[in-house]
Amino acid sequence: MPILRGMLGKVPSRPKGRVRNFIANKEFGTQSDIHENVISPGVIIPWHFHETEEVIVVLEGNGECRTDEGAENYSAGDVIIFPPRVKHSLKNSGDTLIRQICFFPSDPATKVLEGEYPGQTVDVFNASEWAKPIP
């Protein structure tokens, strides 16, 4: 069992940015898909859904979660669970970074329903390319 150290902690490169840092996925040889999301204040993750369940563990910050049922605020320590194919969007409504871990039981097959909002950027990292496995 390898232990991968220093997997978390990337930050957006621009003020209106966010980071998607892949921690486990098929490139790691895992069936599950796990990534760290880091979202700058004011940034909105566009409407999308996944073919699998998504579980989000919020480590830092606070935001707004939107679904067809409405909007609800969330903060550090909360867990958000989306069943398969539930359309959702997340917004950092606070003044600090949101840091959250997203878990999927398999390839999420994400379907994005709209483009990035003007001025927003996404930095994507695959930790398998830079993390050091410890045997």
What are the functions of these language-model segments?
Residues M1-Q31, G115-P135:
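A short, N-terminal "cap"/entry segment at the start of jelly-roll beta-barrel domains
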Residues I34-H50:
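Conserved short histidine dyad/triad with adjacent acidic residue
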Residues E69-P84:
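Short acidic-glycine-tyrosine-enriched beta hairpin
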Residues I81, D95-V112:
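A short hydrophobic beta-strand segment most commonly corresponding to one strand
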Residues E53-E54, V58-G63:
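Glycine- and acidic-residue-biased ligand/ion/polar-headgroup-sensing regions
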